[in-house]
Design a protein with these regions (language model features):
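Extracytoplasmic metal-acquisition and chelation regions
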Residues: 2-15, 19-29, 33-333
Length: 333
């Protein structure tokens, strides 16, 4: 584990590592046909903007991207999230027959460098005339965060998200130029919502007594440090497969006591035994965060009092989970 300095000189504890997925295994996973009706597949989560009768179907590579697509598409296109409800978008990979054909799809929207299967799928689909590949991250510069070099979690920043939404709207307009003005207008409406989230973030930070949080599951949140100056400490890396060493945990326990932190935060899409044990060790409470990488129907494993809906979009994940958690953890109530 490394202890790094943020832009304002504060310490941020995390591990600079990430797991790469096997390209060989991916090739097997891209070997067949998705099916006549993607929404009926047991693999996809079936989330869409409508009833399946629209002319165009767009496949998204993870939940946040799916919501950006449906917001920009409006009534003109179906948006399908390939990641099943309950699966974590960071470490899920397609089963054989899910991606290569994408029967009926007009587009595939993905995140660069987020998961190996997405980049490989985009490379394979680029050669096809019937599927338009849209890189949501196009033109977005990753940065070397305390969690990892080239931290790709830009969608956690509501301001940076605005660029991603515009990229998607531009791609949809290329697929369906007759409705280009609508895609631009839909994106502008959603960008207004993202800007409202940004203002709510700033309001919480301005009212906060603390400036630090501890995340005891994988660290997807360092873009909040860059945008809002929130110091984020984690004994875990940026992948759900990363593990914390006893030394990492002990260092974070010391930081919790030194900084007067009263809450340990966890990713709702992951089991969180470390968050629970760490909270018990330092007499803290656990609170949920969402990196918008998992759709959940009901409650996360850790806390049955948290109720989620499988069709929540980006704004719901932030307003129902992230902002209330930060308000409490940073003592901005």
């Amino acid at each position: 584990m490394t202890t790094d300095l943020s832009d304002d000189g504060s310490r941020v504890v995390s591990r600079r590592n990430f797991a790469a997925l096997s390209a060989g295994a991916l090739a097997t996973g891209l070997a067949g046909c998705f099916g006549d009706d993607p929404q009926e597949s047991a693999n996809g989560n079936g989330s869409s903007t409508g009833n399946g009768d629209r002319e165009y179907t767009i496949f998204a590579s993870m939940p946040a991207v799916w919501d950006f697509v449906r917001q920009a598409a409006g009534d003109h296109m179906e948006a399908i999230d390939l990641v099943p409800v309950g699966e974590h978008g960071h470490d899920w990979t397609p089963e054989p027959g899910m991606v290569e054909e994408l029967d009926g799809a007009a587009g595939f929207v993905y995140l660069r460098d987020f998961a190996a299967w997405q980049d490989d799928a985009a490379d394979q689909l680029e050669g096809r005339d019937d599927v338009h590949v849209i890189e949501a991250s196009d033109g977005i510069e990753f940065f070397d965060s305390p969690a990892e070099d080239d931290d790709e979690h830009w969608w956690m920043d509501p301001v940076e998200c605005q660029n991603g939404v515009e990229n998607i709207a531009d791609g949809l307009a290329e697929i369906d130029p007759d409705n280009a003005d609508d895609y631009e207008a839909n994106a502008a409406t959603f960008i207004d919502e993202l800007e409202a989230l940004n203002e709510e973030f700033h309001d919480i930070v301005e009212r906060a007594e603390l400036n630090s949080i501890v995340v005891a599951t994988h660290d997807s949140f360092q873009w909040w440090n860059r945008r809002y100056g929130i110091d984020i400490y984690s004994p875990v890396g940026t992948s759900p497969d990363d593990a914390a060493s006893p030394g990492d945990v002990e260092e974070v326990e010391t930081l919790i006591e030194d900084l007067g932190i009263e809450h340990v935060l966890y990713d709702v899409g992951e089991p969180a035994p470390l968050a629970e044990s760490l909270a018990a060790e330092v007499d803290a409470e656990i609170l949920p965060l969402s990196p918008v990488e998992t759709q959940i129907d009901g409650s996360p494993e850790v806390d049955p009092s948290v109720e989620m809906e499988p069709d929540w979009g980006y704004v719901e994940h932030f307003r129902e989970l992230n902002l209330p958690t930060l308000e409490t953890a940073l003592r901005a109530e």
